[in-house]
Structures are given as structure tokens and as C-alpha cells.
Amino acid sequence: MQSRLLLLGAPGGHGGPASRRMRLLLRQVVQRRPGGDRQRPEVRLLHAGSGADTGDTVNIGDVSYKLKIPKNPELVPQNYISDSLAQSVVQHLRWIMQKDLLGQDVFLIGPPGPLRRSIAMQYLELTKREVEYIALSRDTTETDLKQRREIRAGTAFYIDQCAVRAATEGRTLILEGLEKAERNVLPVLNNLLENREMQLEDGRFLMSAERYDKLLRDHTKKELDSWKIVRVSENFRVIALGLPVPRYSGNPLDPPLRSRFQARDIYYLPFKDQLKLLYSIGANVSAEKVSQLLSFATTLCSQESSTLGLPDFPLDSLAAAVQILDSFPMMPIKHAIQWLYPYSILLGHEGKMAVEGVLKRFELQDSGSSLLPKEIVKVEKMMENHVSQASVTIRIADKEVTIKVPAGTRLLSQPCASDRFIQTLSHKQLQAEMMQSHMVKDICLIGGKGCGKTVIAKNFADTLGYNIEPIMLYQDMTARDLLQQRYTLPNGDTAWRSSPLVNAALEGKLVLLDGIHRVNAGTLAVLQRLIHDRELSLYDGSRLLREDRYMRLKEELQLSDEQLQKRSIFPIHPSFRIIALAEPPVIGSTAHQWLGPEFLTMFFFHYMKPLVKSEEIQVIKEKVPNVPQEALDKLLSFTHKLRETQDPTAQSLAASLSTRQLLRISRRLSQYPNENLHSAVTKACLSRFLPSLARSALEKNLADATIEINTDDNLEPELKDYKCEVTSGTLRIGAVSAPIYNAHEKMKVPDVLFYDNIQHVIVMEDMLKDFLLGEHLLLVGNQGVGKNKIVDRFLHLLNRPREYIQLHRDTTVQTLTLQPSVKDGLIVYEDSPLVKAVKLGHILVVDEADKAPTNVTCILKTLVENGEMILADGRRIVANSANVNGRENVVVIHPDFRMIVLANRPGFPFLGNDFFGTLGDIFSCHAVDNPKPHSELEMLRQYGPNVPEPILQKLVAAFGELRSLADQGIINYPYSTREVVNIVKHLQKFPTEGLSSVVRNVFDFDSYNNDMREILINTLHKYGIPIGAKPTSVQLAKELTLPEQTFMGYWTIGQARSGMQKLLCPVETHHIDIKGPALINIQEYPIERHEERSLNFTEECASWRIPLDEINIICDIATSHENEQNTLYVVTCNPASLYFMNMTGKSGFFVDFFDIFPRTANGVWHPFVTVAPLGSPLKGQVVLHEQQSNVILLLDTTGRALHRLILPSEKFTSKKPFWWNKEEAETYKMCKEFSHKNWLVFYKEKGNSLTVLDVLEGRTHTISLPINLKTVFLVAEDKWLLVESKTNQKYLLTKPAHIESEGSGVCQLYVLKEEPPSTGFGVTQETEFSIPHKISSDQLSSEHLSSAVEQKIASPNRILSDEKNYATIVVGFPDLMSPSEVYSWKRPSSLHKRSGTDTSFYRGKKKRGTPKQSNCVTLLDTNQVVRILPPGEVPLKDIYPKDVTPPQTSGYIEVTDLQSKKLRYIPIPRSESLSPYTTWLSTISDTDALLAEWDKSGVVTVDMGGHIRLWETGLERLQRSLMEWRNMIGQDDRNMQITINRDSGEDVSSPKHGKEDPDNMPHVGGNTWAGGTGGRDTAGLGGKGGPYRLDAGHTVYQVSQAEKDAVPEEVKRAAREMGQRAFQQRLKEIQMSEYDAATYERFSGAVRRQVHSLRIILDNLQAKGKERQWLRHQATGELDDAKIIDGLTGEKAIYKRRGELEPQLGSPQQKPKRLRLVVDVSGSMYRFNRMDGRLERTMEAVCMVMEAFENYEEKFQYDIVGHSGDGYNIGLVPMNKIPKDNKQRLEILKTMHAHSQFCMSGDHTLEGTEHAIKEIVKEEADEYFVIVLSDANLSRYGIHPAKFAQILTRDPQVNAFAIFIGSLGDQATRLQRTLPAGRSFVAMDTKDIPQILQQIFTSTMLSSV
């Protein structure tokens, strides 16, 4: 209905100033309108007769309202009505007036923005009504609405709050933000709204006016007052303002509440009205631009755009934007739009495209960057009616524009004056833009963390002369914290203290709201009115008004400032401005979308782009002038490469390399120029604790940026450098020194038991460097690595007092800073350690920082960064004392104050919060790791000085391995030094306890987790900690008795038959011809050494493998013993190569000689290489000799040089035999008995000369002989035993000690005769000469000799062994010329005789001669001869009992012990693989193992599969080892006293299931109930003899061990059968055959461990997601510190308790994560499965996914598809049909197998990946994962890897990973290089596939939950 506006002024009316203003106002309204337009609604003001109180009437159209004169005119809104009211607003006002006349309450509903509020205020201004305004937030409670208690003079009073005041005084109550209030708070008002009645806390009762007036007729006012009845004014009205909730977030309206309001939709102003308004503002802007701008904005507010998920455009900010454009008409509009609506950081890709489309549609795209503001040119101060302003000149394009902006009270500084601020181009531009916004509105600055927002804001404030008020916001901040807090006055009265924000508003400061993205939107709502209207109502009833409104009020009421302040009305300073700082919203995530439609209306947004590289270099260079240039360039190109990658992993790494962090690194580099950049970066990223994916991505990127680990830093630095020392007031740690602090408070300096070790000293040195640079430190590490100890030691050395504070779950911001407590009714604050440390300059140690919620620890940021912090009692901490000048309540930070924060590493299994992620970049981070083995050993020695060294070494090694398993994620618990130290302390105190029982103190935690237990036991066994062994499990070889010795006769020297005494042999001397050196590559490989005595004690004490090719053949081994180091050399001959290793070390080395030994021309060439290690001074050099080609090589293993030595005899060797000559190839031999003395002897078989090679002198001596040689034994240095080839006649060659070059020394050859004992008649029995296999080159000691031949004797002797005798001793040989006696222990039958027949069939031809290796050693120190025999030569019947089948072996070690006259046969386990060349093998040795001496009392064997084993054979040594071993196990079987074991004495009958108890009561013992605990025979937990475990959920009572052991066998068997039956039953239920069950078990069992650990992590996630929160304002629970005062006043709801937090209002449903596994089921998988089992591994991986995610469907939804030649989308597991049991899972595995068997060939990896990525995003989910398994031979199908890389990263929402199953050659690794880091894996070994999957899950999926 159209109405007319009339203006009728009664002449001479005295309506007072108010009515005069109203008339003027209405007159203006009318004058603006063109006359004669009669279709408009009108507002009229009518006067009644002169002087009447309620004289004036307001008419809006046909609705009129009588004005009343307000009692408190200062409460009437001022200055809200604008000159020209838009038609739509007039319509709204008319409607409100109608409702007002009806006495109804109204609800103005509509989109966010100030419009609804301003309409309400305009109405109230028009009708002269007093207003009570309350902004509801989630912190509003009943007391804020009704009555609050205050204490006055020791008595609690009730003070009426807004609703009650409004009702009694007849004001209008405006409730803003109903959707913000928590549920069930507002119903308090229901009755007041409906019946105008309310019961108050103080006993009064509000009653509606009509009823009150009725009562008043019958009763007097006095009576009613005595009944405490109060009249509600008939003028009381409520206006509620709210958002429509389904569209915006918030709590929906309560139906009873809703029904009490009349609603009116207040949408944005209509297009025309809005356009008119904008035209009036922006006179300089072309009309076309304005209308385009408005059209754009209106489009984005339409229904369609909200269905796209775009937030509403803030239409209300348009006026401000047009105001800027009015001053800068040349500025592109698109640019201004970005400020109002920062769509580029707010929206995902699709949203951006939509907005860009609308921009194009309205031709707003033309943003020439040349028209953007460039910089601020100058700033001048000016005063305009007492308001300080600045005129700022901004250069835009090439014009300069001057604008007026509000300024602060301090002096202005020119834009580039600050020395701490470095101007870069983008920053200048940003400042200019901020200046433009500052002209009209508050600013919100958005930028990543550490990019300099605070610095920019501060510089901006300096430029305009503002004082800054930084306010750090945190997550659980309440509205009270923002506005006013309660405190007590000294007399005990309660009062309100204004917050810094309110003070700043009054004083005209610039407020920095730091971290506005953290605060709950419901809390920020209280600031809306301050930001939009510059008005604020506080809790204590005071009101802050905008300055012009305040002035108007002052002038109208003719009051002074003091009088207004008495009425608690204050002006807001016109210069007051807010700058909010925030981190960009997380695009696409539901949880972190703080930038909503409501927020958009409050600020102008400026995005602070990360610095570009050149600018960042400029900043760093100017801040740190002498930073090394090269390092800086590398660092920045690396960082920017990370920042530009889309990959989330790279992004998170880049986040920890913020500008702030780069500056820190640069400062350190400039201070310590030889620092290593690699370690600086890894330290900043804390790479030690990154998930494995992120770590590998970081390593890859570092390698690409050529940032290497310094190789010249030797891994173990010089030990002498690293120590801490204090000299004359200076502390030196390593290379860094610092002055020692002079502490006042000595008792606060920590003093701690600390044993220095190198690694901790290095950490402390590193800390000291940063400490001296003024950094605050953050130490991150696993538990028990000594973080606290290091810090205490560090402070002790520096002599700094420390304050200690430990955080935990319930730490709040208040408890961090102050502890409030009540004393005598006053509230008193006690300083927390933090404040004390700040005041006194102590070091604050914050322990367990990751346990507190991150929203609490955030407040440390401003303290560390800016040195500012506000305390709960109103004091503030400031950094520089210059700012203090006379302000009270200020604490200045002491210059010596520092913070050291300790936290556990982020991520599983530590259930802390990610402290490092949120605050890592403001501290200097140090990763503290467990000490390296030798540091740890050093430390443990000090903890356990009496603990035997080997035990410490074992512990260190075993724990080292466990830690590396924890790093790989195979086990969850990271074992730390703390655990080892505890073990060592125990052993130190109780030395008799066995190690294996003491380690259980640590490992019993894991005893119920079978997978974990298995890993632990294996690891401990590997290092020889015999956990689980019993003292009785000793399994030494059985001893057989040696036959009696027999006297064999004499060896006599000389007296040749011909009568010749001796033969002389001439000698020639030559120099060696040396070729070379050639540098040779020596590869290192790790040794996995297993201590073998884990479960039982045997002769074998350790073993390890060398990485041998399957076809390779070991042909010789040798050991060298140099100063305590035993080195083992192993030579192989196909191809020729050498392995050598220190027998105690961690790594071995490998040299390949394939291309060095010459291949001879004849077809079949079987090289045979022997090795001789040389001794000191040629330590580390070895001589290698090939027997057929007689090539001699000298290899220097330390210098990596190879020489070839050419002997003179070689120069004229006979013609080479070709394959058609059937003659035998020649064989050359090397005698190496004295190689440790650096000389060797070479001879040719059947040759007649010997060549002595003296390596040290570089000479050879050739001795010519009159005989042809068969073998040579060097029995002493100067006496050699020779055997002639045809007759086996022995000779003794003596040579002078040193053959001189003159040739004077001549060698003499004697015949050696073996004479049998004389039979008395001169008849000698003929003996066949046997060739010894081995003759010792030294003699037995005389005790050994005496006990061997059983007569006291001292004489030279040699011990030898041959095929007929176990051992032979020759007494007197070789030094005495008299006949030597020969004693033998004869074998029952000769060796090698039997083997001739039975091997001839399966080894091909008959054996040619004897094998080349005799495998025989003499151990003189233990009086033993040791050799290896094939099983056929061993008396197995004597060793093993009848019914035992002998094990498969590589051979037996035969130990002939002449001391105890015993024989032992020790089996060598058979080798895992054998070379297929069996004939070749048989020429080398007749067993599959070779033997050498290990040390004085043991031997080493190497089998043909490359397995090296160390054996102890000496009896004394074995006895000693057995003692140690028994000590390690401890005496578990000692009987303890005071134990009373009550045996129940009952027998066990047959097992049964037992009765099920209907009430499920716990049953203990008895013999009846099923599911009981601890009974016998019935199924249950922990009983004896029960059939299977049945858990009814009660505590378990254990039957004592002895009783368990007493269960008879047949009962056990029955129990097992019953268990079997239950299993059968389960199979039957899911219809699975046993064969199927076994098949499934094959796949499932292989991944059980991974499934298990994944499920543990998933469970923890579930738990973490379900973590309870603190619920405030509770009536029961723990006292909430923030509400102590409310408690004093006697309020009820002052407690807090833990509870499930309601999901935040309007926050969307948590969606599950989506995973799609794309597996390769192509034909090649089936085809190559035989080679590497890839198909089975893939099936295992699928099985793992299905099992791990079972029952987590609401968190993770997965489906599995396959790709093959048949297609790219073969459904295996659809999302809605997840397999439920093993049978269904097996079906899926079978399908995979069958598919790959029968599908077409071809490859659809790319299509499959692309399709999966496209499809998966179609459904909404929290996160998307696509994992592709493929054996893609990409090049074969012509697919370019770059194409694949592009597909993997095509959608930033999807985390896509590819796992390639190792294909041919290095193809897979090449592929990985082209694919993005951390996104692709190569599983060369298919066993890794499940492992890799597990890695992906743990490091990505779980990181973000």
C-alpha cells in the first residue's frame, strides 16, 4: 500500500530540540524528492498542542506512533538515520512500527552485514526509544541476560542486566546474533517474551503491566513492593537480529522461541536503491563502472552462487570500496573486488573459475597491473578539529594522489625510514594499498606464517604515528577476554577491567588482532558492532559511541564529558583502527574455513604474497649483510622450488622454511661460515622426525639443489675437540665459547648427574651457537633421549638459573601466565614461572610442550617474536623499556630471558599435539636423537662401571637396531637411552641377575603383542641376548674318545741311499717387475651379524652373510690378525672377486676383479684364486694369486690401489695349452704360511724351482732344485718340507736366514726318511708314503706336548694331519738333526678312499685328483687339529641316537683335541644356495664349506652360499663363554623362599565348553562356567588345560605355572582338538573349506604385521578424534580459573568439565576419507610372478588394505579396481560391497589371480590412474587418495614418464601415489626420478609393497586426521 510523506509543522510549537531536529531531518528528506511523485510512502511528524509531553507523532504512511520523551535520552540511538532513506528501508520501518503498535516482538532475519542492525537503530532513533543492546555469542550465559552478582562492601548484590533493565524501564532490547548463542540459553527469555513475566534470582518477580495494574486496583504499591513484584513497562519491546541458519552456520532457532517472534526478511537493499547510494558516494567514478561493480556483487549474492558454495559477497562494504575508487578513479575495479572478496585465496579451483567468469561477464577483467598503487611517496601530519590526521601521497600508475587518513598520536615517520624494515617492491605496494583501505575501513592482512605480517603492520603503524596494541588471539578465547574481565578491588569489591582492545578504542591506538583465524566465529560476533558502527556495549553497562554520535549527544543534552562519563558513556577515538592478521584459509577443507560470509563484511582483505626469490634475497642480505653468497643462493632456490610444488608434502616442508626460518639460518651461516647448509635445512624441517615419505622427498629435493652433506666432516669427529670445559669464567663447548653467567639465585641453577658423551656435547655446542645468537630453543626428540638432562646440563654449564613449567592437557592460557587464588575474599594473582623468568631474566624451560593444546601454546608466539604479552591481571609484558615511559602495570622483559622448549617428536605413537607444526618456525629447532653407539657405550660405561663390556656392547647394538626399526615404522615404540640406562643400573646393582631377565623389565610391555614380540626376540637374539633361553639349553657336540696313540717310527734326515749327505741348490735374485697402480673401486655393504647363542649354547658364536651371486664360487679364505683386529678375506672365482671385512665390524667390502684377471684362450677356464694377507708395515695389503695363469696381484685395501707383480720365471713360460691339446694345464701354487712376515713362496706343480717373493724389499729369489715338486710346506722360516712328485719322497730344504744378493748363501737339500719302528731283525716293513694335508709352522708348547704324548718332554715339534691319521706329532723335527719320533692317532679307515666310488656317478666324471683345498687347520694354543669332513666320512651312528635322522649339513667340523684326547663332530648348517657348477665345486673342496683359523682358539667357516660362521673350539674358551652365557641368562631356577604355593590338588578331567552364565558374573576357578578366568578344563582365560581362549571380559586370574605344567598330555591333546573344532565351526559359518582357509592364510599371514600396526594407528586416530574437550559454564566439575570471581559473588555455573564437544554449530558433517586402490592385474603380472612373486605380493597388499580398514568404514571408504589389457576400470571391490569375512576376501584375491591369468596383454596404467582420479572426486569426502600399483614397463608401451607425472598431480585435491614393481634394469629408478618426489615408489623387492603401502597410509592419511 503506497503512502505519502507529509510535513506539517505546527507554527510556534515548542517541541524541544529533539522535535526540531526531527522536523529538519524530515524536511531534508522531502526536499530531496522530486515534487508531485505521489506514489511514495511517507514519514510524517505531527505536533499536538504546545507544551504537551508526548506531543509529537511519527507517521510512516498511514501508520502513526506517538513519541514519548525518553527518561535517559543518552540511551537513544543517534545519527543512524541518513539524509535520504531508501524506499525499501522506509517499508521495513513501517512494518516494525505496525508490530510495535501491536506490542509484538520482531525478528529481523537476513544475510550477514550491518543492515539489519542499522534499520532497528533507525527505527528506535525515529521513535526516540532507549535501547539495550546485547551481542550474543557462544559465551553468553543466563547471567548476562538477567542478573549478575557483584560484591559491594562485602555483600553480594544483584545487578540487573540488559533484559531486566529493558523490561522494567520500558526500553527496547536488541538481541543480535541469536544463532550464536549456545542451545538452551535463550529459553530464559521465553516467558518474558510471551507473558512479560520473569522470576529473578534476587527473589523479585517481573509482572506484565496489565496484571500489575489489575492488582494495583486491589492492593497498594507498598504491598506489591513487599511481595517483590515489579511492573514490566508496557513500552518494553524486543528486536532480535539473526541469520537464517540452514544457509549460514549457527544454531537453528528453538521452535518455542521462534513462535514468539514476528519475522521480517531484510535482504540487501534493492539494486536501484543501492546504485543510487553508490552514485552519491562515488561522484568521480564512471557510472558504468559502478553499475558493473554492483551487478557483479549482486550476482555473487544470488541463490545460484550459494549453491556453488561461494560465500556471499559483502554488499555492505561496497560503499567503502566506491569511496576509495572515488579518490583513485584510475584504479581497476577488479583490484578493489579482491579486497572485498579475496576469492583467489578463499575458493578452490572451481570457485575461482566461477568468479572469473562473472568478472568477464561484466567486463571487469581488464586489470592492467600498471594501474596499481606503487608506493607511498610521503606522509604529512595535519590536525583537523582536534583530530590527528595524515595526508598521504600515493603514487599510482604515474600519478600521485593525496588522501586524508586517520593518524595516531605519535610523530609520523616517513615510509622508508625504519631501519629494521626492508622495503621491497611488493611490500611498498602492499603498504600503499593498505593506506587506501585505511582511509575507509579496518584491514585484515592474510598471509602464511612467518611471511612478515606483523612487521608490515608495525611499519604501517609507525608510518602513521600509531601506538600499537597487539592482541594475541587464541582458540578458546571468550567474549569476556576480548572486552572486559572481572577483578577484585583491594576492598574486596568486584569490578570490571577493560581489555586492551577497549582501551585502545578509547585512546585511538592501532589494534593488531593477531591470529584472527583461530578464534571461534561465535566469539568474534561481539566485535561486529564495534567494527561496523564503532559502538560497543560492555558488561558493566558502559557504552562506547562513535565520536560524531557522542558529540551530537553532548551538544543535544548540553552535558560535559565528566557528566557523560558518570552515565558511563565514552567516545571511541576517531583514529582507532583494527588490523587483523590471519593465515590463509585452507582451501577445500571444511574445518579451517574461518573466512565466512559474516567475516567478509567486517574488513578489507589484503593478501600478503610470499616473497619472490629476488625480494627474499634482498631482505636477507640487508638483514644479514655478511651471509655467504653461494649458500644463500642454494638455500633460496631450494626453498622456492619447494614452495612452487603443488604436492602437499612439499608444501608442508616449505612451511617450515618460512622467511623467518631462512633469516635464522642465514644469521647462523654468517656467524659460523663453515656450517653445513644441509644440516641447517634438515634441522629447520626437523627431518629426523618426518614421516618417511616426506623425508625422502626432502632428501631428493636437497640432492637436486646440490646441497650435500659435507663429506669432510668425518662422521666421528676428533674426540679431543669435543669436551666441555670451564676456564676463567668462560665456558667452551666444542669450538664455541661463551661467558659464564653470574647468577644471583644460585639455587635455581640446575645441577644434574650427567655423563659427557660426544654426541650430547655436539648437541650442546649447536644449542650454544643459537643461544649466543639470541634465539629461543626448541628441542624435539623421542622419549628418554635425554632432552631434560641436556638442557639442565647446558644451563648448569652456563650457570643460568632456570624456571620450569610442565604443560599438560589442561593447561590454559591463564595457567601459563598467572595462577589466580582467593585470599581473604580478594583475588590474588601469583606469577607463573613464565612471568618470573621474564622479570628476573631466568631461562624458562617449557617441558612437554606438545601435550598442551596448540591453541594455548600459541600465546608464546608474541612473547618470543615481539616480546609482548598481556597477563590476566591486566599487566602487560613489553620488550623495550622505551615503550614504558610512565605506564603502570608494565613488566619489562629482562634482556637475559630465554625460553627453551622441549617436545616429543610429532606424529604417532606420541599422542601429543603438533607443537612443531604450529610454532616450530619461531624457535631454533634441535632434533635430539639417541646417542650414536659409541657415545652411548661411553655413557653406559659410566653408569655401569662393573658391567662387563660385551654386555654393554650387546645392549647398545640391539637397541640401535630396534630404534632403526621404529624409524622405519616397523615397530611403534621408539626404544630410548633411558631404557638402556635403567637396564645397566639394574645390572650394576645386581650383577648376578641375568641379562635376559633384566631386559624383560623393558620388553614385558610388549609381551602380549605377538608380532611385536617376535620382532623383539629376533632382534635380541641377533645380538646374542639370550631372552627366552634356559640355563639347561646347552647343545655342544658329543665327545667321542680318540683312539690310543701309536708310535710310528722315526723321521731321519740325510743319509741318501747314494751316500750323498746333502745337495746344494743355487739361488738367483731379481727385482720384481711391478705394473700399475690401477685405482680400483671398493664397494661397502652392511653386515647383518647374528649372535648365534640366543636360544641355546653351541660352539657357533656368530654368523653373517656376504652378498654372493648364485653362480659365484668361493675358492679361498684367509684371516689376518693385526693389533687386536681380525680381518677375514674371502675370494671367489666366478667372477673373480674379493670380499673382506673386520670380523667385529658393521660393514664389509667387496672388490670385483672380473675384468682384471686375464681370461686364457682355452675354452673352459676355471680360475682358482688364493689370497694371502700381508702383515705390518704392509697392513691392509693382500696378495692374490691365480693358479693357472700365475697372475699375482697386490691389492692395497686402504689406498684402493692394485699392482700386478711379475715374477722373472713368468717371462718364459711354456706354450699355453689349447683346448685341443688334451694335456693338463699347468698349476702354480703359493705358500702363504709366512705371509704376515711379508714373504711368500711360489712354485709350479711338477716344476723344479721355488721362487721366494719378498714383498717389502721388492725382490725375488729363485731356488733351482734337482727334483720335481709336488707340494711344499713351510714348516719354519728357514726349513721347508718338500715332497717329490712321482715318489712322494720327502726332502728338507734349509736356507740361510737372509739370502743376500751376492748369492753367498746356498740352500741345502736333505733327504728325509720315514723309518718304521724296527722289528728287531733289520727288516723294515714297507710303508706307503702319505702326503700330509697340513703341517703346523710352529710348535706346541711343552705342556701341550707333554700332555699329548703323555710323557714329560720339552723338544721342538710339529703337528700334522693326513688322510690316515687324526693327528701326528713329530718330536724333534725340524730343528734337531737326530731322528725325530713320530706319534700318531690313527683313523679306523683312511679318508677319501670311500668317496671314490659313491660320488663318481652324480658328480660326472671320476674325480681328477684331490680337491685343491684341504680344509685343515692346526690350533697350537688349544692343542687341536680341526678340519671339515663331508658327512660320508663322519661316524654319524656314534653321534646321533638311532631314531634321529642327521640334519642336512654342508659338512662337519672335526675337532681332534689332543689335550683331552677327545673327538668332536660339529655340524655346519647347509648353505642356502649352491652354485650350479657342481664339478667345478668338487675341484675346490669335497665339502660345501671352507675353513680357516679365526683366532687362537677358534675357526671360521664360509659355506658356498656365502654364509660365514665363527666357531669356538678351544675348551677353555668354551667354558668361559658358557659361564658368561649362563650369567646373562641368570639363575631363573633358584628356589625363592617365602612363596606359599597352594596347589589346588584337583585332577583335570576332559575339557568342555562349560555352562554359559546367564548373568555373566565373573567366575574364578571352579570347573563349570564358560568364559570364567583361571579355572581348569573349561574354556576361559589363563586356566590350565582349557581348550581355547574365551573372553567374557573379566580380569584374568592366572593358575600358577607349576600347576599349568602339571596338565597331563592327553588333556592337552583334547584341548587342542576342541580348539580345532571351534575353528572348523567358524569355517563352516562362512562356508570356507580348510584348503581355502590355508590359501587365505598364506596371503593374510604375510601381511599380518603391517595390518596390525596400521590398525593400532587407526585405533589411536579414532581415539584422538573422539578426544573430549573442556565444557565451560557447568554447574558441576572443576573450578574454572576464569570464573573465580563469579564464584566469589555466588554464581552457580562456574565449573568446567570434560565432555564430548558438540560439533561446532553449522560445521559440516565429518566426511570419511576416500581411498581408491588401482592394482595391476595385467598378464605380465601373472607371467613374471614366477620370477619375483609380484602378483602374490600385490594380492597381499590388497589383502592388507581389506583387513586393515575393516570396521573403519565410517572413517575410510575404499574401493579397489584393477587395470589390465582388458580395460582400465575393472571393479574388484566396489565401495558399497566391502568384503566382510575371509571367504569374501579370498574370492576377491582369486578374481585378481584369475583375471591376470586370462586377460589380454596391454597396459592401461595411465588410463586407470586418470579415470580413478577423475571418478574419486565426484563424491564428497574429507580427503582423496589414489594408489596405483603397476609393473608398468612404460617405455615398452611408448608412454612418457612426464605424462604419467602430469596425471598423478592433475588434481591437487587428490593425493595420488604410484608404486612400481621393479622392472628391468634401472628403469624403475629412472622413472622415479621424473615423477614428483614422495609420490612414487619403486619396489625392487616385491616384499616391500605392503611396507610401502603402510608408509603411505601412516605418513599422509593419518597426518591430517
UniProtKB/Swiss-Prot annotation:
It comes from the Eukaryota. The keyword Methyltransferase does not apply. SMART domains: AAA, VWA. GO terms for cellular component: cytoplasm; mitochondrion; peroxisome. Residues 1-28 form a transit peptide. Residues 1714-1896 form the VWFA domain. Residues 1542-1563 are annotated as: Disordered. Glycans are attached at N284, N855, N1096, N1142, N1833. ATP binds at G447, G448, K449, G450, C451, G452, K453, T454. In fetal eye, it is highly expressed in the retina while expression is low in the cornea, sclera and lens. Exhibits ATPase activity in vitro. It is linked to Retinitis pigmentosa 97: An autosomal dominant form of retinitis pigmentosa, a retinal dystrophy belonging to the group of pigmentary retinopathies. Retinitis pigmentosa is characterized by retinal pigment deposits visible on fundus examination and primary loss of rod photoreceptor cells followed by secondary loss of cone photoreceptors. Patients typically have night vision blindness and loss of midperipheral visual field. RP97 is characterized by onset of night blindness and visual field defects in the first decade of life. Monomer. Isoform 1 and isoform 2 interact with PEX7. Isoform 2 interacts with isoform 1 of PEX5 in a PEX7-dependent manner. This is von Willebrand factor A domain-containing protein 8. It comes from Homo sapiens.
